């Protein structure tokens, strides 16, 4: 190679290197990757690390992909847990849907049973200006306790209306000398005076309330909280209609309104539908019986005097009226009568 040719080649080589250096200098700018001659790692300017570096981008995508899997697994789990905690059921417990239990299926055997059903109203002393009706319906707490003492001493056993029905329909055995205690109208003194005495003597009564009067919180009548307390302690409740009308000769629509209104009001507060209706003032008719029977009631109570019952008369049960003038001895004589 001639000296001139060698010089020309050197010049070209130098110019080539200068061109490469210029290109690299022009392309490299802030945030672009540079190769570390010592570590061989990728370095990225903080402001552009994610956007411009390939490996971090791939790394973030992998994290996102990894995170997406737990998201699909964890989020539904967390959501279902929250729902299970905050919304356990559609209906709050313990007042679940009110139960409506069908009555016992008759076994086909005709039975006649003698079971006195005592009928009380007020358990309190009548006010000084009370009329003759109020005085007649008022049994003082002292009288009432004497009545309960007499029942115990004379060997009577307090049963429920349900017990009577099962005995008539299926022959369920009753204790000797059974008797049933009923209270009409739902007066407040039934809670303040009768209820404590019934607990003392370990007895149960049937209380027939006028549901609209309770809803309206009428003075002198039990409240729902009092009724709930008594029911929780084992006392029984039935309907005395919505507003104490004469149920005889009314249209079916009106009777349905009365039957279902009284029934649903008690079910809402006690968790079960009442089984028994006490006809207001003892006034009822054939259509009354038919409607209350179709509404799921098990039977009805009248104000007619008597102590003998059959299954055919379960919607016309007779009772023994207890008056304000009756002593324990008077009650004993009433219980012994063969009505």
What are these regions (language model features)?
Residues 219-225, 255-258:
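Charged helix-capping and loop-helix junction motifs
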Residues 2-15:
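Bacterial N-terminal signal peptides that target proteins for export
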Residues 24-26:
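C-terminal motif of bacterial Sec signal peptides marking the signal peptidase cleavage site
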Residues 195-202, 222-238:
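Acidic (Asp/Glu)-rich catalytic clusters
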Residues 46, 51-52, 64, 87-88, ...:
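C-terminal active-site subregion of NodB/CE4 polysaccharide deacetylases
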Residues 29-112:
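Ser/Thr-rich, Proline-interspersed low-complexity disordered segments
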Residues 202-222:
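A short, conserved beta-to-alpha structural element at the edge of catalytic cores
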Residues 118, 183, 236-244:
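Histidine-centered catalytic micro-motifs
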């Amino acid at each position: 190679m001639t000296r001139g040719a060698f010089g020309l080649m050197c010049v070209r080589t130098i110019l080539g290197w200068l061109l490469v250096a210029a290109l690299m200098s022009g392309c490299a700018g802030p945030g672009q990757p540079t190769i570390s001659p010592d570590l061989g790692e990728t370095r990225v300017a903080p402001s552009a690390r994610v956007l411009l570096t390939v490996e971090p981008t791939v790394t973030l995508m992998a994290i996102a992909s990894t995170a997406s899997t737990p998201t699909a697994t964890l989020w539904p789990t967390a959501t279902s847990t929250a729902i299970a905690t905050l919304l356990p059921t559609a209906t709050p417990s313990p007042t679940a849907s009110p139960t409506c239990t069908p009555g016992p299926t008759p076994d086909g055997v005709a039975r006649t049973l003698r079971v006195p059903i005592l009928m009380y109203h007020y358990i309190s002393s009548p006010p000084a200006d009370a009329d003759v009706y109020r005085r007649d319906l008022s049994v003082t707490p002292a009288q009432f306790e004497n009545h309960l003492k007499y029942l115990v001493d004379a060997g009577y056993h307090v049963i429920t209306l349900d017990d009577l029905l099962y005995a008539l329909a299926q022959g369920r055995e009753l204790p000797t000398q059974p008797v049933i205690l009923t209270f009409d109208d739902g007066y407040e003194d039934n809670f303040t005076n009768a209820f404590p005495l019934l607990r003392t003597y370990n007895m149960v009564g049937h209380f027939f309330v006028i549901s609209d009067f309770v809803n309206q919180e009428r003075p002198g009548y039990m409240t729902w909280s009092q009724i709930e307390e008594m029911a929780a302690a084992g006392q029984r409740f039935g309907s005395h209609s919505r507003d104490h009308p004469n149920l005889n000769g009314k249209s079916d629509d009106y009777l349905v309104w009365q039957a279902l209104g009284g029934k649903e009001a008690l079910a809402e507060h006690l968790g079960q539908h009442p089984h028994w209706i006490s006809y207001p003032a003892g006034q009822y008719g054939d259509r009354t019986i038919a409607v209350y029977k179709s509404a799921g009631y098990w039977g009805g109570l009248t104000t007619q005097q008597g102590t003998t019952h059959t299954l055919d008369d379960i919607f016309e049960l007779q009772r023994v009226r207890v008056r304000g003038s009756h002593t324990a001895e008077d009650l004993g004589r009433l219980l012994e009568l063969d009505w």
